[in-house]
Amino acid sequence: MTDRYADFPDWILGITREIWEDRGLGARMRECYGADAIVRTPAGIGRGEPAMTAATMATMVELPDRQLMGEDVIWCEAEGGGRFSSHRIVSVATHTGGGVLTGPPTGRRVTYRAIADCYAEGGKITDEWLVRDNGAIVRQLGVEPRDWAAAAVAAGRAEAFTLDLDEPGPYGGRGDPGEWGERYADLLTRIMGAELSVIPANWDRACHLLYPGGVTAHGWDSADRFWLPLRSAFPSAAFAVDHVIGRGDDPMMPPRAAVRWSLSGRHEGWGPFGPPTGAPVHVMGICHAEFGPFRGGRHAPGEWSVRREWVLLDETAIWVQILRHAG
């Protein structure tokens, strides 16, 4: 990348630290983001570096001592040039400032994850999809996601990303699945096809699971208790795998996969979002997975398994869509 960074993952980790923790806004932000960059989140879409800078400053006000610790960068070369990264971050911060997401300052400590899917060309990020675990944030501040969304709807500041808001950016690729990306994307597709039996067949019996709302869990039952209710809440929604990266040969790392996916349809079933309302809902999700050799009790010898799984979606954005429909 440059003399300052060893490679593309190092660049992604480094500019994140420079922008957020070193307060590298202004000129540094313009060096790292294209003037017309598009950033999509479950809460909406932002266009251009000035919007990125404004959103960054607003979060800095809410959580001024935030540390962003990069857990992994799963990446690939992009078709036609450039590179694409799926960057998983765990943040720790103190809520000492007020803001739209967090409300009046509470002094509470928060820990949460985000995954940013970024396309970079010519040393600048020009296309991005970002999912932050807002459900974990508001819960740690003493508010349930449904209550937060209800207040946002009542105040007239409820926003959510829907497909009709999207616009094409400079990146039109679908990733580089490889063996491990294809495997994980296939598993998610089968789960969303109600084939829940793939969990005990393909997840390790002692799998480590990190789910929305800051949930940490282990084992097949925990995976089933996350995926089944999510699908049940939107039983007829169209599931799409939007982007896949697989990596199997990075030194000192297990095989990994990053999958960005979406559910588009109506809230027609029971699940984590209460009684069915018929509300139109779009869910943007990003998952990371690590694979390993340990097979639990239901695998044929020699097979692989999902040992760790990270899933991110924004519960507050889903509730906004449901409650906005209810009026």
Language-model features: where?
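C-terminal and inter-domain tail/linker signature
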Residues: M1-G327
